[in-house]
Amino acid sequence: GKDKALEYFDKLSENILSYTSSGSGPINALIMKEAAIGLGMTPQAVTKINEGQTELKIKYFEEGSPYCLYGQSIISGKENRAAVKEVFSFLSGKLTEENTEKFCPEKIYKTKTFDVPNYPAEIKYADMSGDTLQAKEAFLEKWKY
């Protein structure tokens, strides 16, 4: 259960260089040979591989890769302001398309397909159906790293 998982992390932490708050930290630690394993983000690893860091290898947990969902919203009552419309249009249009084209080529558009060299073609994603805000807050109350 959850307590056993936390006990596991207590033992594992003896061999952890650091728990980073940045997504690039684990990848940079690998490149600088400060770590043998880094839990990082796929697009950052792919970017470094494409820049010539060919010793990096992308592996996923047997249970699947964790994932994040992103979205944009506008505060109610602000949606008619010209500047808000302009920024929102950029975020949900051009920026999302450029990000998908350059870093995260997974299929999100019906009519567009992007290809990023060395980006894994088939990523198995983990079942994160119980990953709620309440579950995260409860976990963070016990997390000491």
What are these regions (language model features)?
Residues 7-10, 28, 32, 82-85, ...:
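Solvent-exposed, polar/charged alpha-helical surfaces in well-ordered, non-transmembrane soluble domains
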Residues 68-80, 99-102:
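A bilobed periplasmic-binding-protein/Venus flytrap-type ligand-binding module shared by bacterial periplasmic
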Residues 90-113:
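Periplasmic-binding protein-like
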Residues 1-59:
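Ligand-binding pocket segment of bilobal, Venus flytrap-like solute-binding proteins
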Residues 1-4, 77-84:
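Short helix-loop capping/hinge motifs at secondary-structure junctions, enriched
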Residues 114-145:
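Extracellular/periplasmic bilobal clamshell ligand-binding domains
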Residues 55, 69, 85-87:
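Active-site lining segments that contact anionic ligands and/or coordinate catalytic metals
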Residues 54-66, 75-78:
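Short beta-strand->loop
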